[in-house]
Design a protein with these regions (language model features):
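Conserved catalytic-core segment of nucleotide-activated headgroup transferases in glycan assembly
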Residues: 31-45, 49, 168-247, 360-366, ...
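Donor nucleotide-activated moiety binding/catalytic core segment of transferases
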Residues: 237-279, 283-287
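A short, gly/pro- and small-residue-rich
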Residues: 104-122, 202-209, 294-305
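C-terminal amphipathic helix plus adjacent low-complexity
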Residues: 329, 333-394
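Catalytic binding pocket for nucleotide-activated donors in carbohydrate/polymer assembly enzymes
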Residues: 284-356
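N-terminal pre-catalytic "stem/leader" segment of glycosyltransferase-like enzymes
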Residues: 1-86, 382-394
Length: 394
């Protein structure tokens, strides 16, 4: 319930709702990272169309207030959500995930519903049949379209709009201080909600990856796992995470000037800056790095030890060195080799175009804003349509 916070900010039932576009986020703060990365983009949208962040959880509501200047409300139950939507003239709702509670909002018939997701990756969850519930689905590029074509029955491509990745137009201040050392970033994903979406390398290869990176001379090693790795309840993941943290912290104590560090809640885009090479899993992190730093080597870990399957399901692995049971033992040498000679630069550039197109700087943001404008115009056209004779009262 939201009894400990105002029902809304700057609005009470019966007064105008302060928003033309809703950003709907129903989950608790553990998933807030999904919304967080979009907030600067939504702040740009707010300049043309007032944006209202609708939350369903009181702690999320409070945290959103610390993250953005956007207006926000907390509506803990369905009756209050229906009242909010009924009292306002909200033209569109935007969704950043596939939360089951999205369907409470999707019941509203006088808004156009836009799904944007919270990243671009080759995880199974990125091509959910839930996409059919939305009027528009904004995707990064051709790879996302292929993913949906292959996964969905009666896929209607007309509702899917490639826009790139607007979040990657942002340039956050770097988290890491300058160093003369080369920086190896290990940024694994979490274990997912089920086995099909479990791509983490933490419990399978994580300690070996950290040890291999730390064995390189003259490097700074940064461990930046997905935030949900640090809070994982999976015994294997939790134990391996503690082991990796211990390895990095022990190396930092032995060599204080090296700059080895563990980062948990920092913006991964800000961590990228200053890194020389990335080791990651099948996740949005690797693709974001590919887009922003196509000139730097990339390693992709495979917990399933199925190279053919990985190459088929995660095409980015074709332009990267793969870390699996067969290669993790020689990882130190492979890292040294890639830092000395980058063998996959041309392949990464081609793969970048496949996933994201070839947008100019800030072009993705422009495409996103144009896609929202088009959706709002479509809604306005629908609103003004004449009723068919059969639908009119006698």
């Amino acid at each position: 319930m939201c009894s400990q916070v105002p029902f809304t900010t700057g609005w009470v039932p019966g007064e105008p709702v302060p928003g033309e576009v809703v950003v709907y986020f129903a989950d608790d703060p553990r998933r807030l990272y999904q919304l967080h990365q979009w907030l600067p983009v939504f702040e740009l949208l707010d300049r043309a169309h007032p944006v209202l962040v609708v939350t369903r959880h009181p702690q999320t509501y409070a945290e959103v207030g610390r993250l953005t200047r956007l207006r926000r409300v907390c509506v803990p139950n369905l009756a209050e959500l229906v009242q909010l939507y009924g009292d306002g003239d909200i033209k569109a709702a935007i969704y950043v995930n596939n939360s089951v509670q999205n369907f409470h909002s999707l019941a509203a018939t006088r808004m156009i519903h836009i799904h944007v997701n919270h990243g671009e990756s080759d995880k199974v969850c990125m091509a959910s049949n839930q996409a059919k519930a939305y009027d528009r689905v904004l995707v990064a590029g051709e790879a996302a379209l292929r993913r949906y074509r292959e996964a969905l029955i009666e896929f209607d491509e007309r509702r899917f709009v490639p826009v790139g990745r607007p979040q990657l137009d942002l340039r956050p201040e770097p988290v890491l201080p300058p160093t003369a050392r080369r920086t190896v970033l290990y940024a694994p994903t979490w274990e997912g909600e089920n086995a099909a979406n479990n791509f983490t390398s933490v419990d399978v290869h994580g300690p070996a990856i950290a040890a291999a990176a730390l064995a390189l001379p003259d490097v700074r090693v940064v461990y930046k796992p997905h935030p949900r790795v640090a809070s994982s309840t999976d015994p294997g993941v939790a134990a391996a995470h503690r082991r990796i943290v211990g390895l990095v912290e022990e190396a930092a104590r032995r060599e204080p000037g090296a700059g080895h560090r563990v980062l948990i809640n920092d913006d991964i885009l800000a961590v990228f800056r200053g890194c020389s090479v990335l080791i990651t899993d099948v996740s949005a992190v690797g693709l974001d790095f590919l887009y922003l730093h196509v000139d730097k080597p990339l390693f992709v870990a495979d917990r399933r030890n199925n190279r053919a399957g990985l190459n088929a399901e995660a095409p980015v692995s074709r332009c990267a060195d793969v870390v699996d049971a067969a290669t993790v033992g020689s990882l130190t040498g492979t890292l040294a080799k890639r830092l000395a000679r980058d063998a996959y630069r041309a392949e990464r550039e081609a793969m970048r175009r496949y996933y994201f197109g070839d947008p100019a700087p800030r072009e993705s943001t422009k495409r996103f804003l144009e896609a929202v404008e088009e959706a709002l115009a479509a809604r306005q056209t629908w609103d003004r349509r004449p009723l068919a004779p059969s639908a009119q009262a006698p």
